[in-house]
Amino acid sequence: MDSPINEINRIRNDRKCVLRSNEFLNRYMLEIDNKDLTTTSYVFSVPIFNITDGNLVNLKFSQENGCLHHTGSNADIIVRNNVVCLKNSCGIVHIEISKSEKEIGSNNMSMVNLSPTLNGVKLRKVINKEKFIKLNIDINETPYGIKFNEKYFSFMSHDITPIFTISVIGDRYIESFTPGSVVLNTKAIDDRHYEIYIECSDELKTVEVECNMYEQKLMLDTTVENRRPDENNLYGASAIIGSGEKYGEQWLFSKINYGIIRNILLKRIKSVRLFIPRLNKKVTEITAYNLMRRFCSIGTTWNNNDSRSTNTAKTVFTDSYYIIDITGFTVDSETQNFIEMLGFVLKPKCDGNSYSLISTGDCYDQPQILEITYYN
């Protein structure tokens, strides 16, 4: 995503849409008045406005004194030589990229390409013969703890809230991305210093990694998979939806954090659609199922999930998105008021060796977008 406004223009196929004034400064939301006297809110899964000055995050580096600078939604980011520094009120994190890489910069010719996200950086690296990336990370104060698996690593401020997360995305430039192609391994040096090794399979030509300071998210979600039935991907920025003999079946559970849209909760709602970015070319048909019971994004795994459902939602796809119409999950058909959704689960429609790589609610480079159209 190069700009939240440009992304909305692309979704609407409208280069001249006029934004409504953000009176309440909902940091996640852009609004547009429609010709039929309705208003559409585009709510991003992470904040798009800076917490201090209220300005829209500018997804471009500036240069000063030989460094790259970026101001995210609640963090300041500085890139000096091969070190990225991310700083906010919760902590200061340094990421040192292996010095064996000869070029580090913000242009596509570099071996390591860095670009700003909404609250951090995305690292894209051309895969070398060693087939791995090494990152040294440290934090200025001992964190409450850490959480990690083969998909992400997080410094935690307490049990469920990260300070900072590194998450592997994969290779967006190959036709079919499979689970297991990218693995994140962690080695502790001490309680503030860690080595991160991101190992890549032979099929990958490049790999992408997101490094972000945490913000509260709109979509509370996690993937579950039968290959690792006691794990989930709570803080990972990408999800793989699909099924296959070698890597098993993978689903995505999700629900709305209603506190983030409290300024429009009392409106009469016309429609609610969720735009989930597609991160690779492969299309796997998916279905959204409305859950009968509330799920916990923190503790849900393949072994303990309850995916019983009441109805399904229409899902279509474009070149950039899966679009899920969840109006029936979230709106009372008679009163047109919001009803609390217990959650939904995305599952592949058919069995077979097919996987799609998509963004989760923790993605700061290609965030999910909730489109809510309401009557004035």
Language-model regions: role of each:
Residues 127, 139, 245, 276-280, ...:
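Non-cytosolic beta-sheet module surface loops
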Residues 135-140, 150, 254-256, 265-281, ...:
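A short beta-strand element within beta-rich, extracytoplasmic domains
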Residues 260-267, 332-336:
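Surface-exposed acidic, glycine-flexible loop patches that form ligand/cofactor-binding
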